[in-house]
Amino acid sequence: MFDVAVLGAGAAGMMCAAVAGQRGLRVVLVDHAERLAEKIRISGGGRCNFTNIGAGPANFLSDNPHFCRSALSGYTPQDFLALLKRHHIAWHEKHRGQLFCDDSSESIIEMLRAECDAGSVQWRMGCQVAEVAHGEAGFELRTSQGSIRAAKLVAATGGMAIPQLGATDFGLKLARQFGLKVVEPRPALVPLTFDAAQWQPLAELSGVALEVNLQTGQGKARGEFLEDLLFTHRGLSGPAILQISSFWNPGEPIVIDLAPGRDLADELLASKSCLLYTSPSPRDVEES
């Protein structure tokens, strides 16, 4: 009998299991995958963008903003940096407070594994959960590796993004099974893709990136970001688009300012003056 069973050996699951174990609880960590933290492994282009130094409650969408405040005050980006320091993991700030490992994402995975081991967490990898039952004695997990009993259950199975890495709707089904309120899931942090024929006139801009200001939504649901936008062969991407996609609803406009804080008329006049100054005269052309 365990004190806590944690479902999902990703970033949240391992962090939860490690802290619970180090506080003296008997913890088992269960995941259907054979390898730990597949999403950490690919994050940040393989270098793991593990936090943002400026992260605050205003950066999160929630019906209960007080939860974000209490959660972020209870464990800050600086607390995580202190954890990295204890494990001798080097990092750097890439852009606008985004922090990445100097080496690969594997260093973060190994750090979380070590923290779990320090809490004597028991591992059940490659363990399929067929059923979860609850009774007076706690929870019982019927799995491919036998029955697991625990007084408390933590579901940290993540969302449905990137199913090729094993993501499923298991957590949503579990929440509904126990009568928890579930916000209807929809894509977030995604690029915007367009019909190929409609996008064709802009396809030649693929690879061009620039800083923009984006806005969408109204009131509390309004989102505004000053970030980089990237033109792709299928549409728009980059940090600006990934951020605004969490606030956008079908049918709503997205307003894009391609020259934030700049006067385009002045920019064009300056460019014209530069061209006039550098263009060769007809005589220069004839003599050459």
What are these model-predicted stretches?
Residues 4-28:
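N-terminal Rossmann-like FAD-binding beta1-loop-alpha1 element of flavoenzymes
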Residues 6, 10-12, 35, 159-161:
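Residue-level detector of alpha-helix initiation sites
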Residues 7, 148-160, 229-230:
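Short hydrophobic core segments
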Residues 33-36, 41-42, 51-57, 90, ...:
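An anion/pyrophosphate-binding glycine-rich loop and adjacent beta-alpha core
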Residues 47-92:
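Glycine-rich active-site loop/strand segments that organize a redox cofactor
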Residues 69-75, 95-113, 162-166:
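Short beta-strand to alpha-helix junction loop
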Residues 125-137:
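A conserved short coil-to-beta-strand element within the FAD-binding core of flavoproteins
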Residues 152-196:
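Glycine-rich loop(s) and the adjacent beta-strand/alpha-helix scaffold that form part
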